[in-house]
């Protein structure tokens, strides 16, 4: 549904160049909620503005719903008819609402339909339908100043849906909201994704947003995508920065002659007493140094940091037992020799 290839954006000012996007390749499948996460300055907002060509990319291509927007844009400063038509399939939700204070809630939602030349009757019908969809049917005649932050964002979402888009872009839509309101807006986005079949690309710096509603995610740093995939794939990837950030665990070894493991479990494995089975089977004392568990996409997923007595070479068999149970195991304090042994064990398990 959304594909970027070699997407590059360079800003030039007073003889200086700043590269905001550096060859970004991204693919968002139809009907999924895709989160792009990263710190301030990572290039997230530049990415989403290039996806709908609010910013013209310096290089690379953007394809949305089968249309190559970069080809449609041409070289002129203004958008042509074909590009405007392609953009009509894209809705945008902003961080700061951008509602017109002199217009009622209904009139704000009707604004895109006015621009499209729809009749007053059609505009009114569509706006009221959308306000009901976002839970604001009783606020149609209110003004933005009379609304809470969460209600304003709901109006922004309704306005973004006025043109019946196939894709919804969300640029930090919850960052100015309190935690409870954030949860309600995220649930609304997920409901719209399911009810309308919307493809949602959202930009955020909050890990909880990714955990709450995202099917897939990408981590950006300094204008590049450093990791991407489904949340499940990322959690199963050894050494994944995004997985570690989604489920952070801490704790250091109590001595040099100890093995520290990060254990990632999900699905059925999350409900099995694997650690106690390991302790009984091999008659070893296991220390739990840290743990985090949550529900992602309806599945229980968690990470645990445990300590085993003895060096890694002494624990190859117990580690193999854990991997046989379908768990992802990362050895935190392994030496180069232990790393080689660990890699060999993974290969054996894959045969």
Swiss-Prot record:
Binding-site residues for ATP, renumbered to this chain: 38-45
Reaction catalysis annotation: L-methionine(out) + ATP + H2O = L-methionine(in) + ADP + phosphate + H(+); D-methionine(out) + ATP + H2O = D-methionine(in) + ADP + phosphate + H(+)
Keyword Iron-sulfur listed: no
Protein family: Belongs to the ABC transporter superfamily. Methionine importer (TC 3.A.1.24) family.
Known function: Part of the ABC transporter complex MetNIQ involved in methionine import. Responsible for energy coupling to the transport system.
GO CC annotations on file: plasma membrane
UniProt key word Cell inner membrane: no
Transmembrane segments: none
Subunit and interaction comment: The complex is composed of two ATP-binding proteins (MetN), two transmembrane proteins (MetI) and a solute-binding protein (MetQ).
Domain ABC transporter: 2-247
InterPro entries: AAA+_ATPase, ABC_transporter-like_ATP-bd, ABC_transporter-like_CS, ACT-like_dom_sf, MetN_ABC, MetN_ABC_transporter-like, NIL_domain, P-loop_NTPase
Protein name from the UniProt record: Methionine import ATP-binding protein MetN
Top enzyme category: translocase
Organism superkingdom: Bacteria
Topology within the bilayer: Peripheral membrane protein
Primary location recorded for the protein, binned into one broad class: membrane
PANTHER family referenced in this protein's UniProt entry, alphabetically: AMINO ACID IMPORT ATP-BINDING PROTEIN, METHIONINE IMPORT ATP-BINDING PROTEIN METN
EC number in record: 7.4.2.11
The entry's keywords: Amino-acid transport, ATP-binding, Cell membrane, Membrane, Nucleotide-binding, Translocase, Transport
GO MF assignments: ABC-type D-methionine transporter activity; ATP binding; ATP hydrolysis activity
Subcellular locations according to the entry: Cell membrane
């Amino acid at each position: 549904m959304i594909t970027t290839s070699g997407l590059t954006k360079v800003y030039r000012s007073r003889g200086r160049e700043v590269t905001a996007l550096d060859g970004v390749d991204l693919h968002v499948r139809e009907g999924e909620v895709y989160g792009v996460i990263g710190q301030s300055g990572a290039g997230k907002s530049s990415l989403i503005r290039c996806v709908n060509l609010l910013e013209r990319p310096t290089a690379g291509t953007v394809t949305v719903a089968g249309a190559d927007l970069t080809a449609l844009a041409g070289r002129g400063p203004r958008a042509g008819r074909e590009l405007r038509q392609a953009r009509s399939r894209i809705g945008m939700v902003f961080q700061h609402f951008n509602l017109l204070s002199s217009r009622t809630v209904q009139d704000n939602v009707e604004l895109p339909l006015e621009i499209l030349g729809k009749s007053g009757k059609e505009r009114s019908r569509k706006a009221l339908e959308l306000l009901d969809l976002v839970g604001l049917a009783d606020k149609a005649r209110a003004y933005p100043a009379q609304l809470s932050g969460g209600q304003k964002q709901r109006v922004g979402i309704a306005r973004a849906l006025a043109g019946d888009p196939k894709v919804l872009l969300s640029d930090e839509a919850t960052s100015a909201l309190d935690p409870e309101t954030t949860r309600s807006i995220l649930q609304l986005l997920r409901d719209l994704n399911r009810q309308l079949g919307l493809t949602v690309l959202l930009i955020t710096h909050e890990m909880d947003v990714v955990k709450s509603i995202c099917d897939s995610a990408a981590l950006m740093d300094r204008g590049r995508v450093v990791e991407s995939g489904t949340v499940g794939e990322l959690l199963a990837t050894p050494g994944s920065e995004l997985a570690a950030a989604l489920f952070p665990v801490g704790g250091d070894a109590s001595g040099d002659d100890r093995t520290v493991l990060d254990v990632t479990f999900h699905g059925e494995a999350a409900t099995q007493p694997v650690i106690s089975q390991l302790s009984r089977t091999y008659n070893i004392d296991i220390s739990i140094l840290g743990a985090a568990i949550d529900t992602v996409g309806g599945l229980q997923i968690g990470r645990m940091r445990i300590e085993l007595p003895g060096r890694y070479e002494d624990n190859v068999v117990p580690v193999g037992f854990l991997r046989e149970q379908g768990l992802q195991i990362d050895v935190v304090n392994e030496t180069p020799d232990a790393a080689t042994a660990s890699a060999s064990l993974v290969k054996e398990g894959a045969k």
